[in-house]
Amino acid sequence: MQTEWNFDCANIEQNVTLKPGRYKFECWGARGGALGTPFESGFYYGYGGYCSGEITLKKETTLYLYVGIDGRKGYNFNGAGYGNGASGGGATDIRLIGGTWDNEQGLLSRIIVAGGGGGTYDKQHGGDGGGLKGTLGTSSTGAAAHGGTQFEGGRGRDKDGSCDGFFGKGATPENPSSQSGGGGGWFGGAYPASGFGNGSGGGSGYVLTKDSYKPPGYTPTSEYYFDNVVMTTGGNTTVVGNYSDGRAKITLLQSLPFLTVSSYNSTQATFKADHTDPTLLTKIEYFIDDILKETITTDLTLE
């Protein structure tokens, strides 16, 4: 029986259908891009964030996964602000509604997100992705590019909002050939200011809990609340072949029995039993008024 599912960046929607059970979900955001030779020439990547949590699914559930891409590859998939080779890193998220990565209903159905790092240009730092919030991208001009938070996109210097990140989207600069993009995330990171390059902010992460912020139009209900949450800004430091793409992982922690009742009245009920691990379903006992009436040991998964 499969107990682990891994997802790498694919530039498209991916999906998985899980049986009832207790699971751990993990997401790593992608690193932001940089124009030039990082570190040796003074460029500093914004690293992707890491978020995880544990959830109990009480019914069979189909989930949609969007895995961010390293900003050096020049894509804007899953919220990365476009900036040529200095694009922001894409966010990695798991959501309840599929479709194109940027469709509004899909963005409003995300239950866990790891932010992407901000892109960087001209010997500055890109901000790291969240985690609880993305960090600041630095600028030689003092034009700060803030990271996304739980409640709003990162803000740049221009007061008209043209440099700011948005819900699910990092900022794309007016001149992508010489400026960096903000990291994707729950809320995306900003880029510094019109006409300036330098480092952009990282996107924020998110994990749905009882106390987490739910924006207007948000659709997931309390059945998708997580516990044992971990949110680490800049938590994706894995590099493979000079790139640090996002990734996602789902691990089955505990298999569970479950029962689907299709009809019932005062004298009879029609039901179907199953188990996350069918080999562990060995018998069905039914009771009336706490009195055992029958034990079924054959054809256990028939209706």
Describe each model-derived feature in a short phrase.
Residues T17-K24, K58-T62:
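Extended extracellular/luminal ectodomain segments enriched in beta-structured repeat modules
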Residues P20-G21, A30, T276-L281:
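Short proline/glycine-enriched turn/loop motifs at strand-loop junctions of beta-rich domains
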Residues Y45-H146:
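Secretome/extracellular-domain signature
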Residues S255-S262:
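Proline-enriched interdomain boundary motifs that mark the N-terminal boundary
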Residues S266-H275:
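A short beta-strand segment in extracellular, disulfide-stabilized domains
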Residues T282-Y286:
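Short beta-strand elements bearing conserved aromatic residues within extracellular beta-rich modules
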Residues T298-E303:
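Solvent-exposed segments in extracellular or luminal domains encompassing
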